[in-house]
Amino acid sequence: MRLNDVKPQKGSKKRRRRVGRGISAGQGASAGLGMRGQKSRSGSGTRPGFEGGQQPLYRRIPKLKGFPVVNRKIYTTINVEKLADLPANTEVTLESLRASGILTAVKGPLKVLGNGDLGVALNVKAAAFTGQARSKIEAAGGSCEVLG
């Protein structure tokens, strides 16, 4: 077999249908576009989103208010109840939580949230604390340190 012997697979090369070239060609007269109407005329159809004069969807739905925060801080969050499993007087940081397997996906600096109860005293170092989280950690005898 040589390069000049290579032929395309049977049925892989389909000829383009020539429409509107007489009734015996199979797609004569209206060329498969139907009888009348805007979609059968030249210059084909309507723009995307046009609903025939009905108020289109993009104008029926109200505009969104506000604007996105440009420099939004994305935190890795953890609740106080997850910290309750750690032994007492442990220093809790993002790295230590990752090493212990409590946190797996790290999206950014650590933020401690106040859901759940805490019964052990811990030294927690994080970028941010919620008010509830701070009060629960300090009530258990621990300390909160905000990292810059």
From Swiss-Prot:
Keywords: Ribonucleoprotein, Ribosomal protein, RNA-binding, rRNA-binding. GO terms for cellular component: cytosolic large ribosomal subunit. Residues 1-57 are annotated as: Disordered. Coiled coil: none annotated. Part of the 50S ribosomal subunit. Binds to the 23S rRNA. HAMAP family: Ribosomal_uL15. This is Large ribosomal subunit protein uL15. It comes from Trichormus variabilis (strain ATCC 29413 / PCC 7937) (Anabaena variabilis). The gene is rplO.
